[in-house]
Design a protein with these regions (language model features):
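Glycine-rich phosphate-binding loops of nucleotide-dependent enzymes
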Residues: 1-174
Length: 174
């Protein structure tokens, strides 16, 4: 919950009591530390907490085939190239991991993705790929808010920039 003020999204006042409330509205977050499970495959990371299931009698079990198929389709849509959705995240480069975190945030009809320092820990070559991915999100109608100290990256992908200093808005540009 905000410590102060109100939250409006698409013109409606919203009260968010949990991360699930945010997700249900189409608001997602990509954290600076990525919050990926390195020991799990890419597909399972994308669906973590929202895994498709199938019925086995009275039990529900994870549908690994569907996880793989849906993950690969989503990665293709975003033009993210990996060997397989079965590949473990710990085997990926920093840029690929960032791409998987972005794929996870956009896999469920996201309307707005907030990214905290999406290029901070990446090599220059990988930065370009992540910026291309962010531009691709814009093309498919996903709004993106980027929190970053790398102004070159901001100017490369943002349509509007707001600079904050100690919580105060001190500059804006379009």
């Amino acid at each position: 919950k905000p410590s102060k003020g109100e939250l409006y999204f698409n013109g409606n006042k919203e009260v968010l009591d949990s991360p699930r409330d945010s997700q249900n509205l189409g608001l997602e977050m990509v954290y600076q530390d990525l919050a990926l499970a390195g020991n799990l495959p890419i597909g399972e990371n994308i669906f973590l907490g929202r895994e498709p299931t199938k019925n086995l009698g009275f039990l529900k079990i994870l549908d690994y085939k569907k996880i793989k198929e849906m993950s690969e389709a989503h990665l293709d849509k975003l033009k993210i190239h990996v060997k397989s959705a079965d590949q473990k995240v710990e085997e990926l480069s920093g840029g690929q991991r960032q791409a998987i975190a972005i794929a996870r945030a956009t896999a469920f009809n996201s309307k707005l993705v907030i990214m905290d320092e999406p290029t901070a820990a990446l090599a220059i070559k990988e930065v370009g790929k992540v910026l291309d991915l962010i531009n691709g999100l814009k093309k498919i109608g996903v709004s993106v808010i980027i929190i970053s100290h790398r102004m070159d990256d901001i100017f490369a992908v943002c349509d509007r920039v707001t600079a904050l200093f100690q919580g105060t808005n001190f500059a804006e540009a379009e």
